[in-house]
Amino acid sequence: MGFCGKLFKDPEVDMEKSSANARQMRLLFDQTVEGGNEYRLIFGYTEDVSRFNYGFVHGSKTKIGNLIVGWREADQTIVVVPTVPDLSGCGDPTYYRRSEILKAYRNKYPTDAFIIYPDKRSYIGINAYDWLEDEKLYVYVSQADELAAFTDFFMNRFAKK
């Protein structure tokens, strides 16, 4: 590999750090969700974008919400637990059972997100990637295999229109 190859090399995942965070995600999820060990897990996040217009100044502000997302194929349930990037704590779980939701689908544009409408008034958009490098905003975890399994579950056994 020449100089240019080293200069433009993609960042590499620190698997030790990723594994430690995956274990911490599991610990938090299992403490919060009854029967948590029966669920498979991925890291996901939500984006809340607000726009502003002050005369000549226009813009937007984005808030990121970190999520531990668990799914169980046996009863077609997704559980979402809010957390923070350093995994120092988490909030209360929200359950989405396929039999109880209004609709669920994958939205490819403008962002690749898994959208769940539990009713007509609310929804959650779960964004998930195999790895995100920004540790200040996101949980540092590599999850290519888990994300592929979640995508398969969501698209083939959970989605409904």
Describe each region flagged by the PLM.
Residues 2-73:
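Anionic N-terminal interaction surfaces
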Residues 5-16, 26, 133-161:
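Terminal and domain-flanking low-complexity segments
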Residues 34, 44, 100-101, 145, ...:
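Short linear sequence elements within intrinsically disordered, low-complexity coil regions
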Residues 42, 107, 117, 140-142:
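A structural detector for beta-sheet-dominated domains
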Residues 46, 50-52, 61, 78, ...:
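Residue-level detector of solvent-exposed, low-hydrophobicity positions
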Residues 55-117, 123, 132, 153:
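Phosphoinositide-binding peripheral membrane targeting modules
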